[in-house]
C-alpha cells in the first residue's frame, strides 16, 4: 500500500551510518525523509549533496533530514564521509520500510526516490517524487504545517 498525505507513518527503528538507532516514535521535530536507490551513484550523490547544501535551511524551518536506502552501515558511512553529509543515512537493508511506505520502483527494478515531509506526530504532510527539487519548493509555510 502506498502511503499518502494525511497517513500516519509506520513505526520504525533503524540504524544510521554511525550505528545509532533512529526511531519514528522519537520525533521531536518535523522530518524530511528521503528514500534514494543507492550510495555512490551519480543521481543519488546529487540528491544527497543537495540535501547537504540546504541542510541549514531545513534546520531553520524546524525539520530534521534523514536519508534512507538499503545500503549497509559501512556503505552509508563511506558515502556520508566522502560527501560530507551532516545528516543520518538509515539502513533499510531488506527494503522493509521502503515497502511499508510504498515507494515505487522505476522501470520495475530500480529502487525509486520519494521525499516525505512528516510532522512531529508522524503524519505525512507532503510527498515529492522529483529528487530534491520538489522538496526545496516547500520552504514556506514551515514543515510543521
Range-by-range predicted roles:
Residues 26-42:
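Short active-site neighborhood of thiol/selenol oxidoreductases, capturing the structured segment around
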Residues 116-141:
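Thiol-/selenol-based redox modules, centered on thioredoxin-like
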Residues 66, 77-112:
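Short, internal strand/loop/helix patches
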Residues 41, 138-145:
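Conserved small/polar residues in nucleotide/adenosyl-binding loops
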Residues 9-10, 30-32, 106, 112-114:
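Short loop/turn microsegments at loop-to-beta-strand junctions
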Residues 1-11:
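N-proximal helix/coil linker or "cap" segments that precede and/or mark the start of modular domains
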Residues 45-83, 96-97:
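Structural microenvironment flanking redox-active thiols in thiol-disulfide oxidoreductases
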Residues 13-30:
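A short beta-strand-turn-helix
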Amino acid at each position: 500500500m502506498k502511503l499518502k498525505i494525511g497517513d500516519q507513518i509506520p513505526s520504525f527503528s533503524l540504524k544510521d551510518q554511525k550505528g545509532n538507532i533512529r526511531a519514528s516514535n522519537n520525533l521531536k521535530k518535523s522530518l524530511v525523509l528521503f528514500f534514494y536507490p543507492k550510495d555512490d551513484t551519480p543521481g543519488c550523490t546529487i540528491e544527497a549533496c543537495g540535501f547537504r547544501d540546504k541542510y541549514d535551511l531545513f534546520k531553520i524551518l524546524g525539520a530534521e533530514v534523514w536519508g534512507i536506502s538499503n545500503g549497509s552501515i559501512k556503505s552509508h558511512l563511506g558515502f556520508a564521509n566522502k560527501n560530507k553529509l551532516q545528516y543520518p543515512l538509515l539502513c533499510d537493508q531488506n527494503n522493509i520500510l521502503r515497502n511499508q511506505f510504498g515507494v515505487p520502483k522505476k522501470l520495475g527494478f530500480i529502487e525509486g526516490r520519494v521525499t516525505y515531509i512528516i510532522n512531529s506526530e508522524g503524519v505525512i504532510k507532503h510527498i515529492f517524487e522529483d529528487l530534491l527539487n520538489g522538496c526545496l519548493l516547500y520552504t514556506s509555510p514551515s514543515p510543521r504545517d
